[in-house]
């Protein structure tokens, strides 16, 4: 059987080649050493590749003391050349937790722990309130919680939200007749309508003393006494004192025309 040759070790970061050694030295501030003095060059490059890879991923700058190199697993510590002092850098930043902030009194604040959901007692766990919220007074029975819920409801109501760039639309006033309950949008129309119930005629003719409910009706009536008929029919030339009388007269002409056309067809 022939001798089996072991393959060369593969770097942890494949994109870093041996030519990047000078770049790694510039980044980490290492002294320039010829490559022939580094027998374990692959391990040296792989070690710095981990540091560079962590730097490119955007991990926070958390440093470990130099004594932490002794706690590194053997597979990784064997890659480090003991002749060079490497700067301290985080080996596994996703495992290391950030230091808790110390308050002014010198005490470390307790971590906020949320109780686990009890799947064995689903009904009880779903209905009970969060103890952290109850301690802060955010329960439904507390005054602060009820006021906040009330404010949220008023924010969502469309009546409280004015439209941007537009004035709120005014509601139309309604005038209701006290006799029959009929609705009107103008007070004048309601006044004239109520006179039909009360038979009130405040406008009286000075000549014949005839009374009218509306002022325009009295104006049309005065044309009779003046012999002036401003509304004239264009077909027969007959004059009328009121426009509504002329409109009724025109319907008679249209009916006569319809009768003539029907006789011709027969």
Swiss-Prot record:
SMART domains attached to this UniProt entry: ZnF_C2H2
Gene3D superfamilies: Classic Zinc Finger
Molecular function GO labels: DNA-binding transcription factor activity, RNA polymerase II-specific; RNA polymerase II transcription regulatory region sequence-specific DNA binding; sequence-specific double-stranded DNA binding; zinc ion binding
Residue(s) carrying Asymmetric dimethylarginine: 116
Tissue-specific expression: Expressed in adult colon, small intestine, prostate, testis, and fetal lung.
InterPro entries: C2H2-ZF_Transcription_Reg (IPR050717), Znf_C2H2_sf (IPR036236), Znf_C2H2_type (IPR013087)
Zinc finger (C2H2-type): 175-197, 203-225, 231-253
Subcellular location: Nucleus
SUPFAM superfamilies per UniProt: beta-beta-alpha zinc fingers
Keyword terms of this UniProt record: Metal-binding, Methylation, Nucleus, Repeat, Transcription, Transcription regulation, Zinc, Zinc-finger
A GO cellular-component term linked to this record: nucleus
GO biological process: cell differentiation; cell proliferation involved in kidney development; cellular response to retinoic acid; chondrocyte differentiation; embryonic digit morphogenesis; embryonic forelimb morphogenesis; embryonic hindlimb morphogenesis; embryonic skeletal joint development
Entry's family note: Belongs to the Odd C2H2-type zinc-finger protein family.
PANTHER family: ODD-SKIPPED - RELATED (PTHR14196), PROTEIN ODD-SKIPPED-RELATED 1 (PTHR14196:SF5)
Free-text function comment from the UniProt entry: Transcription factor that plays a role in the regulation of embryonic heart and urogenital development.
Protein name according to UniProt: Protein odd-skipped-related 1
Organism: Homo sapiens (Human)
